[in-house]
A protein has these predicted regions:
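Short cysteine clusters
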Residues: 91, 95-98, 141
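Core AdoMet radical
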Residues: 82, 86, 102-177
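N-terminal [4Fe-4S]-dependent radical SAM core
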Residues: 6-85, 102-110, 122, 129
Length: 177
């Protein structure tokens, strides 16, 4: 069976200790795995589904959180830090090793790409919802579960305009390929 495109490393037990071929490079506690996949995550996803019942992004991000264990998706439901807002189902980069779309004969993708194009209203609704209460809030476009966000600017720009009307001094991040 082919392994999905996750990060892997060698592990060895030596004198009852685990050793890995890796180097610790980031001291940002916000991405510590202990903060994610908690027992109450299902309940938090259901709460946001109830708060935003007609928003397709909530369903998509709930799946990203519960199936693929995506940290930026989970942050929406935990109402903290950086929350990703996938916006583009298409891409023009054709990256070797794309984590959201692989040819059928290749290895499985570690997450599934968004299959719809969110409306400006859906994007703005998620952004505003997150910014209302999240400490150190950031909203970002260009997640692993989407294509190239710059191909969705006709939906992202009006959404950002709505968000900026309510939250002018806001951190937004656009990751382009």
């Amino acid at each position: 069976q082919m392994l999905p495109l996750y990060g892997y490393t060698a592990v060895v037990i030596y004198k009852d200790e685990l050793y890995v071929a890796a180097m610790y490079t980031d001291e940002n506690d916000k991405w510590d795995p202990a903060h994610y996949n908690t027992r109450n995550l299902h309940k938090l996803v259901k709460r946001v589904q109830k708060d935003l019942p007609d928003n397709r992004l909530v369903e998509h991000l709930g799946n990203c959180s519960l199936t693929w264990h995506c940290c930026t998706a989970q942050n929406l439901f935990y109402r903290r830090w950086e929350a990703g807002i996938p916006s583009s189902p298409v891409c023009n980069a054709n990256c070797f090793g794309c984590i959201s779309l692989q040819p059928a004969e290749c290895c499985p993708s570690p997450q599934s790409r968004i299959k719809f194009r969110p409306t400006p209203k859906e994007i703005a609704q998620i952004g505003i919802y997150h910014l209302e209460t999240a400490p150190d809030a950031i909203i970002s476009f260009g997640q692993g579960c989407e294509g190239e966000p710059s191909l969705a600017v006709d939906n992202i720009v009006p959404a950002i305009e709505k968000i900026r009307k309510k939250y002018p001094p806001t951190y937004m991040n656009l990751k382009i390929i």
